[in-house]
Amino acid sequence: MRVKLSMNETYDLRFGESHIEVHKFHAGTILASLLIAVVLQSFLPVYISKAGVLDLPLLITIYFGLSRRNPSTGLLLGTVIGLLQDSLSKTPLGLFGISKTIIGYLASSIGARLDTEHPAARFALTAAFFVLHQGIVILIQKLLLAQPQPWFTMRLLVACLVNATLGVFLYYFLDRLRKS
């Protein structure tokens, strides 16, 4: 017996059926989440200095990438979020655009193959994607902008843990906005 699967389906060898579902959201959920995250990212560090470790647009990119499970959608969402973040920050245009595009694609690709609904899996994936995102940003700054940047700092570790923890709670809230 042969089973043919489309690109976005996973075959479970134990039970003989696909078990990963693609989540749909109410109209405007993605756009509203994106805009709120980008605006908060721009203004929170101005008023609360400790909020500089947060990367809310990255968390939105990861969540919708893992939930929608379509690499093309994740790629485009990461590009839009990254370029919006670049346009509202003091970074060169494209720095976050490139890094969030890669993360959006990878999150969607992994989301299509793994069940990412468990909080521990979400924490681990968010932490890994955060470190990868920061690595891409540092690589771009070193190679393209010739700016010396350290690879690993204590700030990166703290920011990774804070963003992964916040991500688990944020993802729980965003799960409530799914269509049933």
Regions found by a protein language model. Name each.
Residues M1-S180:
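Terminal, non-globular segments
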